[in-house]
Amino acid sequence: MDFEIQELNSDVLGKKLGQKLFSPKGSLLLGMGAEIKEFHYQKIKEVGYQSIYVLKDDYSDVLKSSGHLISEKLRASAPLELKGIYRKLMSKDKISISNGKKELSSMADTLIREVNIKMTNPPDIIDLKRQEDYLYQHAINVAAYSILIAQSVQYHQLKLFDVTLAALLCDFGMHYVDEEILYKPEPLDEKEIEEMRKHTILGFQYLGRNCFIKGLIAVVCLQHHERYDGSGYPKHMSGDDIHEYSRIVSIADFFDAYTSDRPYRRLHSIEEGIEYLKEPSGREFDPRIVRHFLSFFE
């Protein structure tokens, strides 16, 4: 790689930024390749980034790269838009829920159009996620990776649309998890882990009962942490008993989470994520779908 991940501290001063940084409202804070000065450092810190990408000495190829699955503009604006959609879906007002569903469908259409399956560079959508926006930024990335996989396995347009909606909603139930657990800066204890895991059931139940979301889409909320070898949750399902949509989204969800910076653990590189899926530990996932996903990094 032509960039490296560095914890946000004074050591980044004078280095070149390895990715565009945006404010919570989507405005550009600092462009890729810009030298990080004291003013920039303080602003980035104020916005809430915990680590950043810095370019290595020879960074000209990175600046010319076009391997992003989705545009910088959409990556900046979509999380805030999705946050608004979630709020509408959580409303008890039928009109707000209906509007939220329409906006969600529009977002799914936009993401599908943006993902370029014929790219010559490996897909690159790792983002520097602000803690308070992590859920929404993660959902956008999961959707983009899921689209990539779904296109690779030759999904027709309707199935592609469904799996995109499912990916955008897979962590909807996180809204019903205590924020102290959700944003805890250290590893969770066993009781907290059990509470966190309830998001699968809570999301499935709410979307089905209150939003009348299509059954197969809501099922992904329930199943996206199930594992092919039976080691997942909440029902310890295995193999083809797990719906294929869920098997696709589970890989996308894992890969983005694994390559994201979290308060309680360091960010892993794309290479480390790939190696995890290749090793025996990767047996948690459908091997056929894993092969489709990894083919984009070869």
Predicted regions located by residue number:
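Short, contiguous strand/loop micro-motifs
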Residues: 26-29, 133, 190, 232
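Acidic/His-rich, divalent-metal-binding segments that scaffold phosphate/diphosphate chemistry
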Residues: 60-197, 204-211, 215-216
